[in-house]
Amino acid sequence: MNNLKKVALTLAMALSFTACVNDNQEAKPEDTQAEMPAGDPKTDTSAENVNDKDPQTVEEETGKEAKDNEDVDNEVKTTGKIEDEPHYGKPIKVAYNGGLCTGAPGIADVRGEFEKRGLEVEFINVKSDVDSIGTHTADATIGHIAKFVPPTINGVNAVFASGAHTGCKSLYVLDNDEINDTEGLKNKIIGFPGAIGSADHNIAIRFLNNDGIDVDDVKYRQVDNAAIIQALESGELAGAILSDEYASQFIENGTIKRIRSLSFDEDFKNEACCINALNGDFVKENPQMAKLYNEAVLETQKWMENNVEEATQILFDNNWADGDFETAVEMMESYNWAVSLEDTEKTLETVIEDYRNLGIINSEVSKDDFISKHWNSLGIKDSDIK
C-alpha cells in the first residue's frame, strides 16, 4: 500500500470510528507538538484544570466548582419519595455524542429501561463530558476514569456511580522486531490523540510504571489521530496510545501490534475503563431518580454482555455508531460490560494511588477521602443487578 493510500485509509477511519472519542475532545490544537518528560510540571494535572484549559477558565465554566465544592458531601439525603425530588417529571440530561463504549444509556432508552422506571432521558451533544458534569449542563454521562479523576480532585462536582466496562485502549508499536515491549520505548516518543496530561497520557505512564520503566525516560507528544499511523511509520513516534477499535484494521493489515493493553493484560483487564458519572448536586437533590438511572444503565450493561451483536445493532440503527459492523461487534465483545461495582471501586483506589505516586495529582489526596466523596453506587449492590 503506497503512502497516499495509507493516509487516505487513516483519514477515513478517523472519520468513521467514534468509540471513546470523548476522551480527547478537549485537546487544544496548539498542544499538538507538545513534547516533554512525564515529570515536567506541565504534565501535572493537579496543577491544571478541567480538560486542559487554564484554571481561570475552569473556575468560570464550572461555576467556581473548584472552590465551592472542595468539601462536597455526597451523602444521600431523601424523604424516600421520588415525587418530592426537584427534578421529578423532568428528563435526565445525558451527555452522549455517540460511540460504542459510551452507548449503554442510549441502548437502555431504546430497550425501555428508563421508561419502565418512570424516567425520561434527553441525550445532548457536548464538547466535553467532564465540563458538562461540572457545569451541570448534563446530569449524567460516561467517561474515561483516567480523564475524570484529576479534574474531580480539583473540584468538579462529580459522583461516580458505577463502572461502564473494561478495556478499550492499548499501547501500539510498528509490527516489526524493533520494539516488542515497553523497555524498547526508553528515550523514544509515545504519541496519542489527547493533550499532554490527558487520559491518553495518563494511561501511557501507568503502562510504563507497571513495567518498572521510569516515566521520565520516555517523551510524550500529542499527534492528531489521523496522523498517528503515518508518524509511527516515519519514525517520528515509537509507540502510540490508541483506542482498540481504531487500531483494529491496522493490526489486521500488519502495520502495528499491541504491546500493552487495558483490554487484555492481566494487570489491567479487570479494571473499569470508563465510569458512569453524575453531577453531585443532581445526586444529592434527586437520590431516587439517580438510583433508578444507575440501575437502568447497570441492568442494560449486563444485558449487553450477553447480547453483544444485538446491542451493536441498536447503536448502528440509531446512528450512534458507524464503520464496519463486524469490527464493531469484535470490539464490543472485547469489553466486559458487566464489570462489577467492587472492581470499579478497586480501580478508582488503584488509579488514585498510581496518580499520587506519579505526581499526576496532589500527593496529599487520600484514596479513602476520594472514595468517600465521589464514589456512590446509590445503594445498589452487585447482587441487585439482574
Task: List the predicted regions and their residue ranges.
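Sec-dependent signal peptide recognition
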Residues: 2-10
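C-terminal motif of bacterial Sec signal peptides marking the signal peptidase cleavage site
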Residues: 18-19
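N-terminal, intrinsically disordered, polar/charged segments of Gram-positive cell-envelope systems
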Residues: 24-88, 148
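Short, glycine-/small- and polar/acidic-enriched structural segments
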Residues: 65-222, 238-244, 255-261, 270
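Conserved C-terminal helix/tail region of periplasmic/extracytoplasmic solute-binding proteins
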Residues: 73, 353-386
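Pocket-lining segment of extracytoplasmic ligand-binding domains
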Residues: 146, 221, 226-317
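Periplasmic-binding protein-like
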Residues: 164-175, 256-283, 333-335, 368-382
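Secondary-structure end/capping motifs
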Residues: 284-362
